[in-house]
Amino acid sequence: METNCPNILYLSGITIEECLQSKKTSTDALNTNGDEAEVEKKLPSVFTSVSKWVTYSSFKCWTCHLYFKTVPKFVPTYMRENERGEIEMGVLGNFCSFSCAASYIDLHYTEPKRWEARELLNMLYRFFTSQWISYIRPALSYTMRKEYGGKLSEEAFISELHTLEESISSKDIFI
């Protein structure tokens, strides 16, 4: 027997205004990131070099669920040499940072595929930064944000992501 109970979620300390402000902020970021032609553009399915890679994505990060203005990152699905002699990587996802891509791998892959995907992500990091690294720390879960019942404002969450991303090069250099 079905009941007609409304679906109500109560989040202590969160007001409707804060939820609406968060949605408005994300939408504003989308509308100011580029021209209208870019809005529907999807990421290429293949990566060959940083110089040929897209500089913008109109879609939210698959891990943190935020719009972003940084160069989109992805989870490499394979790496090989193509017929032109270029290194080619398969592209999965749309991520604002390497940490968000690492979180996606940790959540959705099992061993040994997880290890392989993490190694390819380290290689992708080298292509973008010219630095060898051994480990990329995963991003915080989006559920840490207030709008999902967590304790962090959107600004504090983004600040934590930036701190994680900056720590990659200073603490995880491959020797």
From Swiss-Prot:
GO MF term list: zinc ion binding
Factors inducing expression: Expressed in the late phase of the viral replicative cycle.
Domain of life, per lineage: Viruses
Keyword terms, alphabetized: Late protein
Entry's family note: Belongs to the asfivirus B175L family.
Name assigned to this protein: Uncharacterized protein B175L
Organism, scientific name: African swine fever virus (isolate Pig/Kenya/KEN-50/1950)
